[in-house]
Amino acid sequence: MRTLDKRIAPNVKLAASLVARAPTLTLAFDARCKSRVAATLDTGEDVAVLLPRGTVLRDGDVLVADDGALVRIVAAPETVLLVRAHDPLTLMRAAYHLGNRHTPVEIGDGYLKLEADPVLADMLRRLGTQVDETQAPFQPEAGAYGGGHKHGHDATFAEDYALAQQVFGEHHGHAHPHPHDHDHQHGPGCAHGRHGHDHH
């Protein structure tokens, strides 16, 4: 069984003909977030994907097998919620509430897309958005939550947190020097957004 253990950096330009000839590996979002997964190429060949922890594959990414061959990633259609609104403010409010719940969201021109969830669908409709369940590839924003299923402790969180603290410090006169190093959950008594001390 071949192993796919390298991803070509997105800024590296490969010849289009080379990429077009590469076999494809079609994966849903959840599988594209895993650094180790047994998968089957669209040609029927079984392969093992072994990538650095925290890697999130996107549609069009190119992997290199242990024999030097290329494989192109395709985002599989999956069940998602397509969220639209009659005005930008309503869509922005929906995005805010989803972000507050650390929900992975794909942001497009006039729409939001997220994994199907009946509770979130109900919340979004109550906010005044139109919510349709559909089959489509899902590519949420990268950033502070990496693939979106983890909160706080992946490759990009430290960078994003440090930047946020720097901006906060510039506006409030001080900053915390490092990100927290513990897991936490948000519940009814959550003090999300507060640092446990008063700002004078």
Curated annotation (Swiss-Prot):
What InterPro entries does the entry give?
A: UreE (IPR012406), UreE_C_dom (IPR007864), UreE_N (IPR004029), UreE_N_sf (IPR036118)
Q: Which GO terms describe its molecular function?
A: nickel cation binding; unfolded protein binding
Give me any GO biological process, just one.
protein folding
Where does the UniProt entry say this protein principally localizes?
A: cytoplasm
Please state where this protein is localized.
Answer: Cytoplasm
Which terms are listed as keywords in the entry?
A: Chaperone, Cytoplasm, Nickel, Nickel insertion
Top-level taxonomic group: Bacteria
* Gene Ontology cellular component list: cytoplasm
What are the transmembrane regions?
none
Region (Disordered), start-end ranges:
171-200
Which NCBIfam families does the record match to this protein?
PRK13261.1-1, PRK13263.1
Q: Which family does it belong to?
A: Belongs to the UreE family.
Q: What does this protein do?
A: Involved in urease metallocenter assembly. Binds nickel. Probably functions as a nickel donor during metallocenter assembly.
Q: What is the official name of this protein in its record?
A: Urease accessory protein UreE
Question: Its gene?
Answer: ureE
